[in-house]
């Protein structure tokens, strides 16, 4: 029993390192390299920057995410959409709910934009380490971009197969990576032990006071050390809170030791540029190529974790009706979270390669990086503060508020990146944001334009037609949004066309504000020959409608569903109509048997 507990204890930590800490774990590759291009490599500046890095990791990752955010899970699930679902239940005012909805849209959009920049900067920065291999010093930047693009291409092609089989290796590889970071850090610190004093926050305060506005703008690069911190909370549903927190103790220690080691190396070699790679090469030239291979593997794992995270966010968005339906494939038979969304995968690949070609170097990419991360952190901070103020944990409000204000400071510092490439963060985030706004507003307008009939009025006509006895043998299913209101396509089928079966079943699938759990309720006899089958599922559940129907003894002959043909002169609704046509419909999303499907077109004026 004790052995089993020990295995699960360490197993959880190792898994977390592979699935959660890839992004933040690969930040040492480029963080100090980028910062040192903007400041002097003297003792005061180096110690000040190291102190800022250490305290950024403590405040923004340990306090904001590991402590505050992770205390707000819903059945173990975390993330921006979960915060929104918690808040919507707590708030009374419609305006507040609308504000929270918009915040969630912004948070999700920034995270999706970040999903493009992270693989690009991680893979490109690792590949750039090839220039330190003897004889490869003059490797053209175009060649490095090509190698990085090929790695990205292979990574995205692999998504379709599912990463289930290789995911077991992610944890052990990342354990070796963090071990290598720790070891190289310790060796470097031993040569210049005075860097350890950077742990004291007075160095950070002194740096900011002495450097004024320039010091303030350095914060926009310091935040690079905390990119990926949001994964602690977002991935909570995959692994659970405790393993992630335990793993963070080890990861935090490895990161701090390595950053201090890099600082010590800068003090001894103030003219070096590619700091992590130069440090490792100076310590063990013979191990440099294996370390470079390990770095590339670590960045691939970091990118993989982020791609899986994007799939998960998009799936949450689909089931909570803030994103259009898309074709989803399940790549694992035993892991619920292992999904593949082809349209998202290929869009990400194109965007990642495009960003590599636009920015060319990882240090240029750093200009676009950070804005999305700090924006997400600030939004998380606002939502957490609102939640704590509406619950019994009011004592956490001042702490959450203080952290949110610090997020705002980092976000403000990042605004100066806008002219230098930071605008790409906003462009990338604006695409999903526009889709979400158009989709949610379009769905509401479409629902109003459809003018559904209330059930009681429908039953008057239905009862008369059913009583005539000209009914088709078997069972017909009709998909509706809710049983109480009948959509026009059902009226067209049954009332106008007299397509009526011996048994007719209204089927509705709605999502609860809990992540998991499925309830299926069959109500017989809501009208003569008419039943209602209502499914209420958690927004992370993968629902097998056919299996649920069979469990209740419903063997359908045909499945009817509505298709809206939208006619409009409004450019906003034209975009909505195009999105609706190009994305999956309800029956495609839920993989219902094609041979039984019968789509009924309704023309709608919007």
Curated annotation (Swiss-Prot):
The chain crosses the membrane at residues 18-38, 46-66, 97-117, 140-160, 169-189, 204-224, 247-267, 286-306, 339-359, 368-388, 395-415, 418-438. GO terms for molecular function: potassium ion transmembrane transporter activity; symporter activity. It catalyses: K(+)(in) + H(+)(in) = K(+)(out) + H(+)(out). It comes from the Bacteria. Keywords: Cell inner membrane, Cell membrane, Ion transport, Membrane, Potassium, Potassium transport, Symport, Transmembrane, Transmembrane helix, Transport. Pfam families: K_trans (PF02705), K_trans_C (PF22776). It is a multi-pass membrane protein. It is found in: Cell inner membrane. GO terms for cellular component: plasma membrane. Transport of potassium into the cell. Likely operates as a K(+):H(+) symporter. PANTHER family: K+ POTASSIUM TRANSPORTER, OSMOTIC STRESS POTASSIUM TRANSPORTER. Belongs to the HAK/KUP transporter (TC 2.A.72) family. This is Probable potassium transport system protein Kup 2. The gene is kup2.
């Amino acid at each position: 029993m004790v052995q089993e507990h020990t295995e699960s204890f360490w197993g959880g930590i190792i898994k977390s390192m592979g699935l959660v800490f890839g992004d933040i774990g690969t930040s040492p590759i480029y963080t100090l390299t980028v910062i040192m291009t903007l400041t002097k490599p003297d003792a005061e500046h180096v110690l000040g920057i190291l102190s800022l890095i250490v305290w950024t990791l403590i405040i923004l990752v340990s306090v904001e995410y590991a402590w505050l955010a992770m205390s707000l899970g819903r059945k173990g699930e975390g993330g921006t959409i979960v915060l929104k679902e918690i808040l919507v239940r707590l708030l009374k005012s419609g305006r507040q709910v609308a504000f929270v909805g918009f915040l969630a849209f912004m948070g999700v959009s920034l995270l999706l934009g970040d999903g493009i920049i992270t693989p690009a900067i991680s893979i490109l920065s690792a590949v750039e380490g090839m220039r330190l291999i003897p004889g490869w010093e003059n490797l053209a930047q175009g060649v490095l971009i090509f190698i990085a693009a090929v790695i990205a291409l292979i990574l995205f092609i692999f998504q379709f197969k599912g990463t289930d089989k290789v995911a077991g290796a992610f944890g052990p590889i990342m354990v070796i990576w963090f071990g290598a970071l720790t070891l190289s850090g310790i060796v470097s610190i031993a040569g210049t032990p005075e860097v350890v004093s950077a742990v004291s926050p007075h160095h950070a305060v002194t740096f900011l006071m002495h450097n004024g506005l320039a010091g303030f703008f350095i914060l926009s690069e310091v935040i690079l050390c905390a990119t990926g911190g949001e994964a602690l909370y977002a991935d909570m549903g995959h692994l659970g809170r405790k393993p992630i927190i335990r793993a963070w103790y080890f990861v935090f220690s490895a990161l701090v030791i390595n950053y201090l080691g890099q600082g010590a190396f800068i003090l001894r070699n103030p003219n070096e540029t590619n700091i992590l790679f130069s440090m490792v090469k100076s310590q063990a030239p013979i191990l440099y190529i294996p370390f470079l291979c390990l770095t590339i593997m670590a960045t691939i794992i970091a990118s993989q974790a982020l791609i899986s995270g994007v799939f998960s966010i998009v799936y949450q968005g689909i089931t909570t009706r803030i994103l259009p339906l898309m074709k989803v494939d399940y790549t694992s038979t035993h892991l619920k979270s292992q999904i593949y969304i082809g349209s998202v995968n290929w869009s990400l690949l194109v965007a990642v390669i495009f960003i590599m070609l636009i920015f060319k170097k990882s240090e240029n990419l750093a200009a676009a990086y950070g804005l999305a991360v700090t924006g997400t952190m600030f939004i998380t901070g606002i939502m957490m503060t609102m939640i704590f103020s509406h619950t019994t944990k009011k004592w956490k409000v001042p702490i959450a508020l203080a952290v949110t204000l610090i997020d705002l400071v980092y976000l403000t510092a990042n605004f100066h990146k806008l002219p230098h490439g930071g605008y790409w963060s906003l462009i990338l985030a604006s695409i999903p944001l526009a889709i979400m706004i158009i989709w949610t507003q379009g769905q509401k307008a479409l629902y109003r334009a459809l003018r559904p009939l209330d059930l009681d009025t429908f039953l008057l006509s239905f009862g008369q037609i059913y009583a005539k006895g000209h009914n088709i043998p078997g069972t017909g299913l009709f998909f509706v949004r809710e049983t109480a209101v009948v959509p026009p396509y059902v009226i067209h089928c049954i009332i106008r066309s007299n397509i009526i079966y011996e048994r007719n079943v209204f089927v509705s699938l709605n999502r609860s504000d809990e992540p998991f759990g499925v309830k299926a309720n069959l109500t017989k006899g809501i009208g003569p020959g008419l039943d209602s089958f209502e499914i209420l599922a958690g927004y992370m559940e993968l629902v097998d409608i056919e299996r649920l129907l069979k469990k209740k003894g419903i063997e359908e002959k045909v499945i009817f569903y509505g298709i809206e043909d939208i006619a409009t002169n409004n450019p906003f609704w034209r975009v909505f109509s195009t999105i609706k046509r190009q994305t999956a419909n309800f029956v495609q999303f839920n993989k219902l048997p094609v041979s039984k499907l019968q789509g009924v077109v309704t023309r709608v004026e919007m």
